[in-house]
A protein has these predicted regions:
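Short glycine/proline- and aromatic-enriched beta-strand/turn motifs that initiate or cap beta-hairpins
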Residues: 19-73, 78-79, 204-207
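Gram-negative (and chloroplast) outer-membrane scaffold detector with strong preference
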Residues: 44, 70-144, 160, 168-174, ...
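Predominantly the C-terminal beta-signal and adjacent terminal strand-loop region
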Residues: 22, 88, 160-207
């Protein structure tokens, strides 16, 4: 968790630093960077499916947070990086306190438009991540006794994350954003599960 928090803090600090350094590069001045945008997003979603040897199929609501930083290379094309962590608490079929957690980060590219105060976009992030699964099939989490039927499994994966969203300008340099995605987490055995859609809400600083 410390590593994930450090990466997210780095994204936020990069957002604030770059925002303060390139306020005048959004015009047609011949420079490669036409603008910058970045911020933080919280998300929720519903995941289902299992790829474990215990015939257990976790499902439930996931919650998480993360950050994004992008530079505009043209009037419609952006690139940058983002990172998120997401946690799904589990109760059905396991003892309360079991969970499935994901962390992923990567390089993104998207295509965007400007329609009035709206900036719809579509793109993909490619990178990597880690799944942490903790399943307690029997036992009492309130005591200090060892439990026999407990599984802790970590699995790295290749992250391919297609997304679609829209930024809404609410003030000069400030936008609200909404985004939906479906993370494809690919491990050595194929497609990682559980999986499902997520929806993100947050704020974006843009220059």
């Amino acid at each position: 968790m410390k590593k994930e928090l450090l990466i997210l803090i780095s994204i936020l600090l990069s957002t604030l630093t770059i925002a303060g350094e390139i306020p005048g590069q959004a015009g047609n001045d011949g420079k490669r960077i036409k603008g910058f945008s970045g911020g933080m997003m919280a998300h929720t979603g519903f995941l289902w499916g299992g790829d474990n040897p215990y015939n257990y199929s976790p499902n439930g609501t996931t919650f998480g947070i993360g950050g994004i930083a992008r530079v505009s290379l043209s009037e419609h094309v952006r690139t940058g990086f983002e990172g998120y962590f997401s946690s799904m608490g589990l109760k059905e079929g396991v003892v309360s306190g079991s969970h499935n957690k994901l962390f992923w980060t990567g390089v993104l590219a998207d295509y965007f438009w400007k329609i009035g105060k709206c900036y719809p976009y579509i793109g993909t992030t490619v990178g990597g991540g880690m799944e942490t699964a903790f399943y307690m099939f029997e036992g009492n989490k309130q005591d200090w006794l060892p439990e026999a039927n407990v599984v802790l499994h970590k699995q790295p994966f290749l992250a391919v994350d297609p997304f679609i969203g829209c930024d809404f300008a609410v003030a000069q340099g400030l936008r609200l954003t909404v985004k939906a995605d479906w993370l494809l987490a690919i491990n050595s055995n194929g497609l990682n599960r559980p999986q499902g859609p997520r929806i993100y809400f947050g704020f974006i600083f843009a220059h």
